[in-house]
Amino acid sequence: MAFNSTPPVSPGGEAQQRPPRFPGEDTTPTSQKEIWGWYAYGIAAEVFAVCGVGSFLPLTLEQLAREHGTLLSSHLPCVRFSSPSTAPGNGTTTATFRRDGTDNDQCVVSVLGLQVNTASFAMYTFSLAVLVQALTLISFSALADYENNRKTLLLAFGFIGSMTSMLFIFIAPPVYILASLLVVVGVTCLGSSFVVLNSFLPVLVANDPSIQTAHKEQGEELSPVNSNGEFVRFEDLDEEISRDSDDHFTTGHRPKTKAAGSASPELQLSTRISSKGVGLGYCAAVLVQILSILMLFALSKTSLPKISGTLPLRFVLLLVGIWWFSFTMVSRRWLRDRPGPPLASSKGAARNSRWRIWLRLIGFAWKSLWKTAKVAVKLREVIIFLIAWFLLSDAMATVSGTAILFARTELKMSTTAVGLLSITATLSGMAGAFLWPVVSRRLRLKSNHTIMLCIALFEVIPLYGMLAYIPLFKKWGVVGLQQPWEIFPLGIVHGLVSGGLSSYCRSFFGLLIPPGSEAAFYALYAATDKGSSFIGPAIVGMLIDATGQVRSGFFFIAVLILLPIPLIWMVNAEKGRQDGLAMADILEKSHREHASEYGGPSEEAEGLLARDI
């Protein structure tokens, strides 16, 4: 039965609130202050993503391990003191641990009884971090929609993540393994918090006064929103709310009244807020990156680097953590709680302990993902694209981590130079997001052809690095990433391509999915992204251990980047769209036929899953 409530009116009598979907829902009109609270968290966390994960965390991990490591050939310390005295503070000098690129000069540390290259240690850490992040994202995605969990989880992830960054100031080389643990926790909190942050957006949009005004001008009654944050008519309200809480497989009706190609006011506002949030986050990241470079330059003039080569880097991570924590506090003050429905009815709460309800929701999240995957398998174009995205997202993640470590260990670039490289890639990525639509329009490229062009340019990066294996170029000492300056043009290529791939792949996937199931399929898209990104770094880490060179990873990366091209070429967007529309009809019809069976302890919509398109 629907929950009926008379829509309240604001004190000024101008902005009318929509009726709540459930008792206790906060339908207060969204204010600019609240939107800025949403922006504030993007400003907070994007700094850790770019300056921490994308720049200084890999360097810190490798340097901490190196200062505790030994040379594989002689078992001498990789870092030795410059004076006979072994007391800290007398100055240190990094030993030459790779003179001719042979295994005998590797700097290694012992991890779980295994001798691991210090660069591999960083790659393995990020591989584990991404895997844990993927498992956490899937498990906790459903919890954010209930009670006050949305804001509680956002703040918890933000505060814990920022603390992990700040705690690096206390991590010395003898306890370098703790740095790996902090990275896993920090990366997990970062990714999880962005998912929770995105869950605020439909709620903010649905309660925005401009949306309410737009619907009023169109002669529509203000109505509650469905699970997608979309307005539903009062005549559909009973059906929408009476659905069992477990039925999130189909999340609304297929839109039939809106003309093709027209964008709803909700979609326009959501896109505008989202794009501005991304832009502000990147601007904040560039600002803090510049501050970090200035800090590194200033600290290089002090005695801190003589005590430990990681101290300046740890001070940068302290700055990043303080920034993340500070702007999370702004979000805490400006974002409203916007609670979701209760986890259980009063009777259910009496019968079940709270932890059992949370476990049930975690199981529900995995069950929902599995249901969506079984439907996706029936959509040929969707499954081909997801396989391509699985490979492509892994390649993008692997290139980023490998490039930072290559610049540091092979090219011997300073931390300041690596910071400048990160800024170059970030600014290029921002430019790429705007440039590729222009290129695609000028060349009249289809979306999948634009993606293929981006991938082809991406392939330039590992191929150029492999040129150093050609004797002629190796003799020259230039070409093939043998000089530090060569990596900056490739950083521009990486940024431009990454910006185009991120935007085009997401929008192209949106053309293929069944209307009305966007939330479920984008959850599968995100799981595919995060679920694959731990494989590449782990394999590159093994190659580094086997060869003693980061450069050897370019062979694997070159193959990994090429694999998605034929798959993207095979995707027929028009057929995929038609299949998606057909599946939407099947899902809607099946939901009506099996609505009475949903929510049972063991029943599933086997009818729709057994059908062929």
From Swiss-Prot:
Q: Protein name, please?
A: Autophagy-related protein 22-2
Top-level taxon: Eukaryota
The UniProt entry's sequence similarity note says: Belongs to the ATG22 family.
Its localization reads:
Vacuole membrane
Keyword Transmembrane helix recorded: yes
User: What GO terms describe the biological role, i.e. biological process, of this protein?
Assistant: amino acid transmembrane export from vacuole; autophagy
Gene name for this UniProt entry: atg22-2
Q: Which GO terms describe its cellular component?
A: vacuolar membrane
Entry membrane topology: Multi-pass membrane protein
Q: Which residues are glycosylated?
A: 90, 448
- Tell me yes or no: is Transmembrane among this UniProt entry's keywords: yes
Locate the transmembrane regions by residue number: 41-61, 120-140, 167-187, 189-209, 278-298, 307-327, 382-402, 418-438, 453-473, 477-497, 508-528, 553-573
Note down the stretches annotated as region Disordered.
Answer: 1-30, 592-613
Q: What does the UniProt keyword field contain? A: Amino-acid transport, Autophagy, Glycoprotein, Membrane, Transmembrane, Transmembrane helix, Transport, Vacuole
Q: Which InterPro entries match?
A: Atg22 (IPR044738), Atg22-like (IPR024671), ATG22/LtaA_families (IPR050495), MFS_trans_sf (IPR036259)
What job does the chain carry out? Vacuolar effluxer which mediate the efflux of amino acids resulting from autophagic degradation. The release of autophagic amino acids allows the maintenance of protein synthesis and viability during nitrogen starvation.
